[in-house]
Amino acid sequence: MVLKSIKITYLLLYKDLKAIYNTYIEKNTRSKKRGENVERVVLHSDANCFYASVEMLYHPEYAGKPLAVGGDPEARHGIVLTANYIAKRSGVKTGMALWQAKQVCPELIFVSPRMDLYLKFSSMLREIYSEYTNQIEPYGCDEAWLDVTGSSSLKGNGRMIAEEISRRVKKNWELL
């Protein structure tokens, strides 16, 4: 389920993402006084296996089975957009042709993407984020950067906010 795969990272500053982070900070700190040293608290949210996780919420019969979202399973062409962890452990990779994925994992279940549904869930995630900050930088429909610098005094430190968001997402989505 999505609930097990939501990941919120506290103060993510990996080398390859530093340019994105610096651009974001520059864009969102112009109103700060020059020379003011403000410690930023930025969270990175990534709902892993997002499309597959959403599909599993609507199809509990897929639980415990390898699942991939992508292409057109009826026409048997296209690529894997995402796969659940079971499929990934079998060697299925994002971007792999559907026929190759089926060779690697013969029991793989394919479903066609339903972007309207994934965007709905993405919007639900952002609604939760917006209760902690209005500084949300989306990165695709399953990832976002959240600047919670101003929220820390009200909601706790960055780690506490990340854990609370993660708990809320899990709780809310279990109810669907």
For each of these PLM feature ranges, what is it?
Residues 9-176:
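Gly/Gly-Pro- and Ser/Thr-rich, intrinsically disordered tail segments characteristic of DNA damage-repair
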